A protein has these predicted regions:
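Conserved NTP/Mg2+-binding pocket subregion across the NTase superfamily
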Residues: 1-60
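Solenoid-repeat scaffolds in large eukaryotic assemblies
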Residues: 65-67
Length: 174
């Protein structure tokens, strides 16, 4: 979130231009290799928390752990949204509020915000298992399609962790 703070807002005074110079470098966003690595990491964490741990914890009756996995899944979904929009993510408390302000994704941002809001309102219990799974898988579809549309990777599996190897290889090739 420090990078988001550094590039947003207004600089009131920088007589020597030192901060402005660094700020312009930061505004160019992450180098492509770093960007690919961050996308790979975030895809993996989204899958781990929402597509793997959440269903496991529910099946085991560990609903507090399931809620934690659900929250982590939402957090990583929002961070992935920022990455795909080439925008630094703000502090966690501002992640959701900033989502509509990111126009670069080819999908309508309202789909993403509505799904995240829906996930946040659903309890991570057995009674809502299908509804929660469907919402998380819908996010995975949106992100997989976006990764393909932006030509970041070839064909993306809906289990986003499967995309991490290709992203890491692209990062290493740069």
């Amino acid at each position: 979130y420090a990078l988001a703070a550094a590039v947003n807002g207004e600089v009131f005074r920088d007589d020597e231009g030192i901060f402005t110079k660094y700020r312009e470098i930061l505004q160019a966003y992450y180098p492509k290799a770093v960007w690919y690595r961050k996308i790979a990491q975030t895809c993996g964490l989204f899958s781990q928390s929402g597509q793997y741990n959440l269903p496991r914890m529910r099946r085991r009756g560990q609903f507090v752990s399931a809620e934690l996995a659900k929250v982590e899944c939402m957090k990583h979904a929002m961070k992935l949204y920022y990455l795909l929009n080439r925008t630094y993510a703000p502090h966690d408390k501002w992640l959701f509020k900033g989502l509509p302000e990111n126009p670069l994704m080819t999908v309508d941002h309202t789909n993403v915000t509505e799904l995240i809001e829906k996930i946040s309102l659903l309890p991570a219990d057995r009674a809502h298992e299908q509804e929660l799974t469907t919402a998380i898988e819908s996010l995975a579809v949106i992100f997989a399609n976006e990764l393909e549309k932006q030509d970041i990777i070839g064909q993306c599996d809906l289990y986003l962790d499967a995309c991490t190897k290709e992203l890491a290889a692209k990062s290493d090739a740069l």
